[in-house]
């Protein structure tokens, strides 16, 4: 049996990468990943850089960096690079709320306004523009399950489809400095539809984050750290990147109309 494992020295821990064959993978096939990414994306300038990890049976079998983490300063992609995960935070928030469900802190069918009173009188949009709306009473109250399934009637400011999307841009809802202000402003904007009627990608998970705070008695970042990140050994995950780790923080890019990455200022 092949056992020639490799050890990668990261800044805060040693990461073991086993021989792929020991976990039922093929080394030669895995090598094709680098070739494909390089020829299809990196050389063509579609991606600035990539970092790939393949794991099986609890073991890391493939770890490879390619291109740059900072194109402008020609900093090669590091194997321990830190990335902004943005909406992947939703999965962490959903885990947190389900942990609290396991502790019987709430039921999935509980109305949200039991825990967030400001949501009790939210109407459904009928006509008007921000801040003057005509609304109707929803068919039923929004539940915590609606938040988890994005069927709450809420929306996002970047959708550019409806007057409610526009209201999210015109109001200060996405510029709120804390969850309390976010919830207070959000509660004054009508719902796009009655909860449960449709699916719509939205700020529902942000509301769940506020519920985590209300139900646990902890700030969201503290809850994540104590109940998710520390137990899983996620030493590089958080809402802010500490000063001592910023050298590992990859620059952020977005695609321009030509499909090429442009540096974003954040």
Language-model segment annotations:
Residues 2-30:
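Short, compositionally biased leader-like segments
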Residues 2-4, 10-11, 122-266:
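Short, surface-exposed loop or secondary-structure junction motifs
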Residues 16-20, 68-70, 111, 115-118, ...:
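Short linear capping/connector segments at secondary-structure termini
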Residues 21-85, 105-107, 121-128, 133:
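Short, conserved catalytic-motif segment at the N-terminal edge
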Residues 29, 115, 223-227:
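Extended, well-ordered alpha-helical scaffold segments
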Residues 31-38, 52, 58, 84-112, ...:
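Active-site SXXK
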Residues 42, 101-102, 187:
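Alpha-helix C-terminal capping/helix-coil junction sites
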Residues 64, 110, 218:
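Short beta-to-alpha loop/turn elements within the nucleotide-binding domains of ABC transporters
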């Amino acid at each position: 049996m092949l056992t020639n494992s490799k050890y990668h020295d990261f800044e805060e821990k040693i990461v073991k990468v086993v021989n792929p064959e020991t976990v039922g993978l093929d080394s030669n096939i895995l090598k094709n990943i680098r070739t494909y990414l390089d020829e299809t994306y990196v050389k063509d300038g579609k991606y600035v850089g990539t970092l790939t990890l393949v794991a099986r049976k609890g073991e890391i079998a493939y770890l490879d960096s390619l291109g740059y983490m900072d194109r402008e300063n020609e900093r090669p992609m590091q194997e321990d690079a830190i990335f902004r995960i943005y909406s992947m935070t939703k999965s962490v928030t959903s885990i947190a709320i389900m942990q609290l469900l396991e502790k019987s802190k709430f039921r999935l069918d509980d109305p949200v306004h039991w825990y967030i009173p400001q949501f009790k009188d939210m109407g459904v949009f009928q006509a008007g523009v921000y801040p003057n709306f005509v609304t109707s009473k929803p068919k039923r109250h929004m539940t915590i399950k609606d938040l988890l399934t994005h069927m709450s009637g809420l929306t996002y400011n970047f959708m550019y489809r409806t007057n409610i999307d526009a209201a999210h841009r015109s109001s200060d809802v996405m510029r709120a400095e804390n969850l309390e202000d976010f919830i207070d402003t959000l509660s004054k904007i009508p719902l796009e539809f009655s909860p449960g009627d449709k699916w719509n990608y939205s700020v529902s998970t942000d509301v769940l984050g506020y519920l985590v705070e209300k139900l646990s008695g902890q700030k969201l970042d503290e809850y994540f750290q104590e109940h998710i990140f520390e137990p899983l050994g996620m030493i590089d995950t958080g809402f802010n990147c500490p000063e001592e780790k910023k050298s590992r923080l990859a620059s952020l890019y977005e695609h321009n109309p030509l499909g090429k990455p442009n540096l974003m200022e954040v």
